[in-house]
Amino acid sequence: MDASLPAHMRPERSFQGFILALQRFWAEQGCVILQPYDMEMGAGTFHPATTLRALGPKPWNAAYVQPSRRPKDGRYGENPNRMQHYYQFQVIMKPSPPNLQELYLKSLAAIGIDSAVHDIRFVEDDWESPTLGAWGLGWECWCDGMEVSQFTYFQQVAGFECAPVAGELTYGLERLAMYVQGVDRVYDLNFNGRDGDAKVTYGDVFLQAEREYSKHNFEVADTAMLFEQFKMAEAACRKYLDAGWREGNRKEHLMALPAYDQCIKASHVFNLLDARGVISVTERQSYILRVRELAKACGEAWIHTEAGGAA
């Protein structure tokens, strides 16, 4: 850890300092530090900086925080560490460097977790995202018996092989910060590193939203409207891609990114419908397949763009 930081910005003192320490570490490894994508998504992997940039031959190194929404995980703010909205810190490096695991351990040291003191283990757990048509060889990263990160080598995204293979790291920020700060309830996390009246906790920032969105996700969200929104997002995705393929200069105007926004939207709407309990087991698989087909179509368009590596 950087001893020159003011006390309130040290990663063991504040949630925001914790995030800044990770951003600084990965910036020093050559990653571009991106901002969160401005759409609702279930995981940081959905960010186009990972899903689309993992495809094609061009090198790409990026890191970013991404708010993640999983409507079914809400507990009305009553569970100490389970929420429908939380933060992930995502790192993608393509091609994957040979020392990625070593870099990960150094990143833990940067936030106050020394592998010489703590029991750090990598438990084999291959990763898969059915809605993204993606999978990879992976490991859960455990610290003193608690899962804190996921470590994956992407093999396939949107149904396409990843060549070169990209390495991805996903940090569960709240869980790691709770461990570093030594608190048992996420809402007790010190957010700004201050004391007394100046102290702002995670609960001060997010508890009211967690209560209200849990009610929204389980009880209030209009299911008829959501079904219609899914169909609209699905249709828009395909319409944008069709328009892109008709363009003369395909490498510049394939519409992969606007279309992928609609894929993200469809995925989130599906998650809301799932939380409302209005999708049967059979229908659930059908919806997952429909989102996967959108992701695949967007991935195909992306690899034909200049940014995606098309010649």
UniProtKB/Swiss-Prot annotation:
Highest taxon, organism lineage: Bacteria
EC numbers on record: 6.1.1.14
Pfam family name, one: tRNA-synt_2e
InterPro entries in the cross-refs: aa-tRNA-synth_II/BPL/LPL, Gly-tRNA-synth_heterodimer, Gly-tRNA_ligase_asu
UniProt-recorded Gene Ontology molecular function terms: ATP binding; glycine-tRNA ligase activity
Listed PROSITE patterns: AA_TRNA_LIGASE_II_GLYAB
GO terms (BP aspect): glycyl-tRNA aminoacylation
Main location: cytoplasm
Keywords: Aminoacyl-tRNA synthetase, ATP-binding, Cytoplasm, Ligase, Nucleotide-binding, Protein biosynthesis
GO terms under cellular component: cytoplasm
CDD domains: GlyRS_alpha_core
Catalytic activity: tRNA(Gly) + glycine + ATP = glycyl-tRNA(Gly) + AMP + diphosphate
Protein localization: Cytoplasm
Entries under Gene3D superfamilies matching the protein: Bira Bifunctional Protein, Domain 2 (3.30.930.10), Class II aaRS and biotin synthetases, domain 2 (1.20.58.180)
Assembly with partners or alone: Tetramer of two alpha and two beta subunits.
Family: Belongs to the class-II aminoacyl-tRNA synthetase family.
Name of the protein in question: Glycine--tRNA ligase alpha subunit
Organism whose genome encodes this protein: Bradyrhizobium diazoefficiens (strain JCM 10833 / BCRC 13528 / IAM 13628 / NBRC 14792 / USDA 110)
Record gene name: glyQ
